[in-house]
Amino acid sequence: MSQKKKASHPAINLMAGGTAGLFEALCCHPLDTIKVRMQIYRRVAGIEHVKPPGFIKTGRTIYQKEGFLALYKGLGAVVIGIIPKMAIRFSSYEFYRTLLVNKESGIVSTGNTFVAGVGAGITEAVLVVNPMEVVKIRLQAQHLTPSEPNAGPKYNNAIHAAYTIVKEEGVSALYRGVSLTAARQATNQGANFTVYSKLKEFLQNYHQMDVLPSWETSCIGLISGAIGPFSNAPLDTIKTRLQKDKSISLEKQSGMKKIITIGAQLLKEEGFRALYKGITPRVMRVAPGQAVTFTVYEYVREHLENLGIFKKNDTPKPKPLK
């Protein structure tokens, strides 16, 4: 059963994770574009009754005015960062679990599984996710937002956007909002890995098999992926505004003061519900994304192991949490 499962070779984790991330991006990136547009929407000045558009209307507007490919704006930045992101996520998660395993029983408790997930989320946020998202959000936000109706495209692609941001604003601009990104990724991955591990263990024991059917893996990935967005939606909304906003007044403030300023401005101008703006497409983006990620990851890893190209690590994985 799962207690006897051998650890995969690091190269297998890298290849399986990268492939899973690529499929996730291709399948779910349009939902992320809609989510970002909803979060950065500004009410039209002087017209109180104008409400921010909803998920379907936002997606339809993007498609009608900018074309189908506009839904994939910023995809280049995601694809460029997806392989190291997934490699860091899965490898760091396994590394932290190894540190937290009970040396006598070989068991990782539920609490320590959550801590390992939190550590993996923080690690990926600092090394990959934040710079990638700054570039992605700039690309997604540069066309036809209500507050900038006549603005032309400033960035041609992900590489050009990254170069322009660093040239005009410095390397530190790529880490704008990193504390919020780290907090978001930490809660996401903590909940994600904990729920996924528990559900996977339950189904493995129920079926008396190590390899679950793909549809079951998708279901538990969907469930685990849906939890995080509800707990940290305000952080994600503030982070998106912070990474898009380049105002001089904000540049003079400390990181925490920027967060407080943007949060207070959101509450004052748009109300409490603005902190949860984009929650629907975010759940629709993250939950199916995790379903795709875990399903593809498990599938590719199993097939790479069966090919026998890489030798498995002889050290067993920590026993499932009890």
From Swiss-Prot:
Species in which this protein is naturally found: Saccharomyces cerevisiae (strain ATCC 204508 / S288c) (Baker's yeast)
Known role: Transports cytoplasmic succinate, derived from isocitrate by the action of isocitrate lyase in the cytosol, into the mitochondrial matrix in exchange for fumarate.
Matching Pfam families: Mito_carr
Regions crossing the membrane: 11-31, 68-88, 114-134, 177-193, 219-235, 278-295
Record GO terms (molecular function): succinate:fumarate antiporter activity
One Gene Ontology biological process: fumarate transport
Protein name: Succinate/fumarate mitochondrial transporter
Cellular location(s): Mitochondrion inner membrane
Induction of its expression: By ethanol or acetate as sole carbon sources. Repressed by glucose.
Extent of the Solcar repeats: 8-99, 111-202, 212-303
Keywords (A to Z) from UniProt: Membrane, Mitochondrion, Mitochondrion inner membrane, Repeat, Transmembrane, Transmembrane helix, Transport
Keyword Magnesium: no
Family: Belongs to the mitochondrial carrier (TC 2.A.29) family.
Organism lineage string: Eukaryota, Fungi, Dikarya, Ascomycota, Saccharomycotina
Record InterPro entries: Mit_carrier (IPR002067), Mitochondrial_sb/sol_carrier (IPR018108), Mt_carrier_dom_sf (IPR023395), TXTP-like (IPR049563)
GO cellular component, one term: mitochondrial inner membrane
Statement: the UniProt record of this protein carries the keyword Acyltransferase: no
Taxonomic superkingdom: Eukaryota
Topological relation to the membrane, as annotated: Multi-pass membrane protein
Main localization of the protein described in the UniProt heading: mitochondrion
